[in-house]
Amino acid sequence: EARVVTYNVLSSHLAEPTYFTHCDPENLDADTRLARVMEKLDAECARGAVIGLQEVSMSWSGRLHAYFAKRGYAFIVSLYGKPFNNYMGVGLAVPLDVYELVGSDVARLSDTVKFPRVKENEVKLGPLTPLYTLFVSKPIRLWRKITDYRPPMDEWQTARGRFNSILHATLRCKKSKVSFGVSTYHMPCMFRTAADRRVMTIHASLAAQYALNQSAGLPTVLMGDFNLKPGDAGHTLITTGDLDESHEAYPIMPDRYSGEPFVVKPPQKMQSAYVRVNGEEPNFTNNAQIKDDEPFIDTLDYIFVTDDIQVTEVLDLPHRDNINGPFPAATEPSDHIMLAATIRVPAGSA
């Protein structure tokens, strides 16, 4: 059996009292929160869990590295954020007394495929074309360069421009000799328009394809903060391997594109570990209230597994009816809660 955990720890620089105005400031202190995060990780480290973390800030990355090293873990990290979130990224911790780290990969997810490119409109004016180029096209390009003008991006350009990193490890259990692949990812957060939702579908597709391709036929776990609610297009795509092409969030190939068509559907479906055991997704995994916005409480985090993995147990999670106020709180140092599953990888997976 193997234990897998995913936890968005909330960046050290994103829990300001001026932001989480409905939380006790004492529960927002970065050092206090990190100590509480580590307390939650202690029990899972004691079980030899493979742990995926999201929103690992630069300030916390070194301290988490030391934390995991003291417990015999390798900690793979990729930071890609911006100054305001302290360059937050993702981390994957592997207990080296339990597993042989057969292989590891760190990638900017949008670099893992070739995106379709839109061809520029060609103006053909016969013998006047050189004059058009000299007196119209070139001045426009010069003006754009001087003013730093950038035309609005479509969903393909937006999806390609995201820097979110994904991590993968191929692991072999030292005791049973079975192998499996595990990836962790933190999706972009875009939902306001149909184009935004298509960006999310593109990244959900990329994450599933990446995890399955890196595992090269081995049983596969893909876990993290997907910023998708149950039933969203990206969630449907991952869990069924399919999505109706008439869905508003189905990525449509741009007109006049060059290159190969983008493959939307992953080679196989994956299923939520919590659905396997409980018959449904967690009641919520994120509970936050930003300033005077309406409280947000819903499910955004998942542990997805391929059909050849058996899920024997999942960590019990609270119900929203039993929650008193937004997180972070004294008992929850992040605005997300930790998910965990015990899995069984079939013999012969090597």
Label every model-predicted segment.
Residues 1, 50-188, 317:
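Structured beta-strand-rich core segments of catalytic domains in phosphoester-bond hydrolases
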Residues 154, 194-205, 209-221, 226-350:
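Metal-dependent phosphoester-hydrolase catalytic domains
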